[in-house]
Amino acid sequence: MLISFFEEFPTPENLRKLKLVTWPTKLYLAAPSLQEFMRIKSGIRNKNVREFVYWPILQKKEGYWISPFSTRAALKRIFRELEGTKVPVMLDLELPTSRNPLLYLTQWGNFRKNKILISYFIQNYSGDIYTAEYFPKGSFGEAQLETLGVHYPVPKIKIIKMLYHSMHHSLSDGYLIRQLERGKKQWGKNFRVGYGTIAAGILGKESILAPEQLRHDLTLAQEKKIPEVVIFRLGGLNQEYANILKKII
């Protein structure tokens, strides 16, 4: 099982945490443009990072995350810069509720066109595509996510379901296991899971996952033969977490 990391804030301080990573890993780097992603990537010298994935983020006024409620100009900008490339890319498919809820009104007229635009990119991009997504409340929940344009059931993509135990304290072992089994059955080798959070994200108020809970959650993923777990985020890595990860690997 590959253990990888998201990094929403790829500052030198956060990237220095890579010194604790002694196993092959993958790094999902947030950046406002492909050019900035390439600049950050070029400055990282760590033989254990086997792959870098571009995680495009928008300005707050544009929606920050990718969804049909993001501004149309921002979506076109991100997709245009990736034309003709094969850079691995992760679309963080989340609604703008906590960053800019006004977009529900201002972008409603663009919703259908934006959804088609996102779908077209996902289906036609030449490189590897990952999508970070909410976990569904059953099959009906998955249909809701698809209707809202934050889930695209395209066979070629790799789907990362964000099962952040620290932010959803009601997640029981039984529920988590069902989500892992359901994802594996539906998406097979293209199913991934996101665990965390071990550091706050853009909201600044995310609860921190206890080390023992991380160990437990990772063990469940390993038992279900999930090919990759992505931890949010690298900047929260410390020696205690690193020791747990090394034992799991």
Locations of regions flagged by a protein language model:
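Glycan-processing catalytic domains of CAZymes
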Residues: 1-249
